Design a protein with these regions (language model features):
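Secretory pathway targeting signatures of secreted, lumenal, and periplasmic proteins
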Residues: 298-354, 382-386
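Soluble non-cytosolic domains of exported or imported proteins
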Residues: 301, 412, 416-420
Length: 436
């Protein structure tokens, strides 16, 4: 579906903003170029509504209503370009992020916490990878940023050559994919046209319209989108200064039958700011620490950090499960402190489970403390079951009046890599207010 999450703020123009036409005889070369240190203030807004077919577990399918709106305001500084001179890294400083939606009558809100409002955004092809410099992002924060339009990726809306008024060209596929948020773009018939070049508020400004259809696959499945919009291009600073999009997303099932329809409006207002001088300290790189995610839920009595290649698959008041692959998983349980008076009791219970499953133990470790984390102990076994060689790693963590156990599994071939992931997760567990 179209996931642009901001409320349309202005469509009318104030009296001093009326355009004054220029000569129609010229040819125009309209394109953006970027340099490290370029800065923009960007304000985006979305409003959407519609319905889609939803199938709850073990229940019949039903149509649910969807409404949403959002407003986002941030400064973006260009950090680096790739070999084709496209922006592949930028620094964002958010002033405002507000997203709300109603899904089947349930209200949902997403915000950016103050400690993650400065972040770096990496772009690799159509993928956007944000990470914060101050604290781990939650999955909702990550999803919010990576599904927002990246204005620097809209160069395909500009003509690939010099054009005259009313001349048309096909929109670039990369820009269509950016606007539609399709994970796989299968076809595009989006056409752009230079409508006018006018003096707008005493600045030479080009208006480019775009209209058409695009089809592909997003997280909801097969999808067709209908686009109708326009952009303003500031001919003096040579940057996209405004975008308006009216879009319709038609959701389809595997047979190609329509199962939902969502309509929305999206705007980008973009102002060029004075450039800044970058130093080597400004070229931030992702690493295992700054790309971690934060798991924190009202339903669960603890929080923890985890790598992005892991996925939280279930949660309850006292448990959370994570998967990294088909053969790598982790179960975290908040225990009653009286259940295990020693780590040896937990090890004996785990050993009984291993024997019940008829696993053959090939190697085992003693119970050991984790350096630097008081109250955290671990033990492990290398086992074989049904021809598979697995590594089982367990933790007991006592912190204050709380106790946690962790049980994990992975293949023996991957244990060196995954062991450090699981150790990091265990080290990061913290009881929340709900646990007290």
């Amino acid at each position: 579906m179209i996931k642009r999450r901001n409320l349309l703020q202005w469509l009318g123009l104030s009296p001093f903003f009326w355009p004054l036409p220029l000569s129609a005889a010229e040819n125009y070369r309209l394109s953006e170029t970027f340099s490290p240190g370029n800065r923009f203030r960007i304000q985006t807004a979305t409003e959407l509504s519609g319905s889609m077919l939803f199938t709850p577990p073990n229940q019949p399918s039903k149509q649910i209503q969807i409404k949403g709106k959002s407003q986002i305001d941030f400064d973006e500084t260009i950090l680096t370009l790739d070999s084709s001179l496209k922006v592949n890294k930028s620094l964002r400083e958010y002033r405002k992020v507000e997203l709300s939606r109603t899904l089947d009558g349930q209200n949902q809100e997403t915000i950016l916490r103050p400690q993650v409002r400065t972040m770096v955004l990496l772009r690799n092809g159509s993928k956007k990878i944000p990470f914060s410099l101050e604290a781990p992002l939650t999955w909702n924060e990550l999803d919010l940023i990576r599904t927002e339009v990246f204005p620097c990726a809209l160069a395909g809306l500009f003509p690939p050559r010099s054009v005259a008024l009313n001349e048309s060209w096909n929109a670039g596929l990369e820009s269509v994919q950016e606007l539609t948020d399709l994970e796989v773009l299968e076809s595009s018939q989006v056409v752009c046209k230079l409508d006018s070049v006018n003096l707008v508020n005493n600045r030479k400004t080009a208006r480019i319209s775009f209209v058409g259809k695009a089809s592909g696959i997003n997280e909801d499945g097969p999808n067709q989108q209908i686009l109708d919009g326009y952009i303003f291009f500031d001919c003096e600073t040579r940057h996209l200064s405004f975008l308006y999009l009216k879009g319709t997303s038609i959701l389809k099932n595997k047979e190609g039958k329509d199962v939902g329809r969502i309509e929305g409006r999206y705007t980008i207002s973009r102002e060029m700011l004075p450039a800044v001088q970058l130093d080597t300290k400004s070229i931030y790189e992702p690493d295992a620490n700054n790309t971690r995610l934060l798991f924190e839920s009202r339903e669960t009595s603890f929080s923890f950090h985890y790598p992005r290649n892991w996925r939280v698959t279930s949660q309850s008041d006292s448990q959370a499960t994570l998967d990294q692959s088909k053969e790598a998983g982790l179960l975290i349980t908040k225990e009653k402190p009286s259940r295990y008076t020693s780590s040896a009791m937990y090890r004996d219970e785990a050993l009984a489970f291993v024997r019940k499953q008829q696993m053959r133990i090939e190697n085992q470790s003693a119970i050991e403390p984790v350096n630097g984390t008081p109250g955290l102990e671990f033990f492990s076994w290398d086992v074989q079951i049904e021809g598979r060689r697995m590594h089982l790693l367990y933790f007991v963590y006592r912190t204050g009046q709380n106790m946690f156990t962790l049980a994990s599994r992975c293949s023996q071939e991957s244990k060196l890599n995954l062991r450090s992931d699981i150790m990091m997760i265990a080290n990061s567990i913290k009881p929340t207010e709900k646990s007290s």
